[in-house]
Structure formats: structure tokens, C-alpha cells
Amino acid sequence: DKYDVKLLYNPEYSCKNTLATVYRARKFLKGRNVYILSSDNWMRENMYHSYECGAWYSAAHEEGETKEWCLTFNKKGRISDVNVGGKDAWFMYGPVYLSREFSAKFLPVLEAYYQIPGTEQFYWEQPYVDMLKGEAKRRLENN
């Protein structure tokens, strides 16, 4: 169509979480710069740009306690850690931009996670979080 938007059907939607959804979309992600949108978010403003300087994940700030996936940033403003739960924290929320360079590193790990028993209810972000923490290599070596 005019904007080259792809809507994908995931036959595992009722029994698996978003890891399976992004796994199903992997051929559209390889070698491309891609936005991923959450189906339950509404964007008031046009968020698309003809150029993005790199991969990013949007975030929102929560005052007080939260059970969301909270972010820690390094001095350059890049995500350096993610933990479930926090206080007065930025958390993962909304659209994501995956650069082809990021996807080249991330997709092989996501594909391997999809094959591991027990990952059926993983969010697609779990392999990324495990990569940040150095746990992805360990998990993959043990399976």
C-alpha cells in the first residue's frame, strides 16, 4: 500500500506472548530499519521520521512505585539495564525503532529463544534484557 505498512497475523496469539509475534515478523525485520508499534497505544502526533540515528525504545516516567520494566541509562543516555519494578523511574512504554544494525545482533538471539521450551510467555523484550545483563549467552549455552 501507499505507506508499506505490514499487518501480520500470529496464529499463536492465543497461547504465546509477544516473543512469538516478533519471531513471526522476523523476515520483515532482517536487513531493515523498522518501527514496531504496540497494538494498545494511540499516537496523537506523527512519530515517523525519514531518518533515525539508531535503535530506540520509547519510555514514560512513573512517580512512585511501579511494576513496569524500569530502565537504567548510561552517560550517553542509552539503556544499560532493565529491571521489573522500581520507584520514580523511566519504564518501557510504546513504540520501538529497530535499526538494521541492532536487528543483526538481536534477531539471532530472539530466534534461538523462540526454540527454547519455557519461553512461550516471554515478551519479545526478554532476549534484549538478557543480552544487556549477559544472561542470553548462558541461557543459550544451557539449551
Task: Put a short name on every predicted segment.
Residues 35, 96, 121:
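Residues that recognize and position ribonucleotide moieties
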Residues 129-142:
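Catalytic donor-sugar/metal-binding loop of nucleotide-sugar-dependent glycosyltransferases
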Residues 43-118:
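Conserved core of the sugar-phosphate nucleotidyltransferase
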Residues 116-127, 143:
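An accessory alpha-helical subdomain
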Residues 2-69:
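Conserved beta-loop-beta/alpha segment of the NTase-like Rossmann-fold superfamily
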Residues 4-6, 78, 137-139:
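Conserved beta-strand segments of alpha/beta enzyme cores
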Residues 8-10, 82, 141:
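Hydrophobic residues at beta-strand termini and immediately following loops
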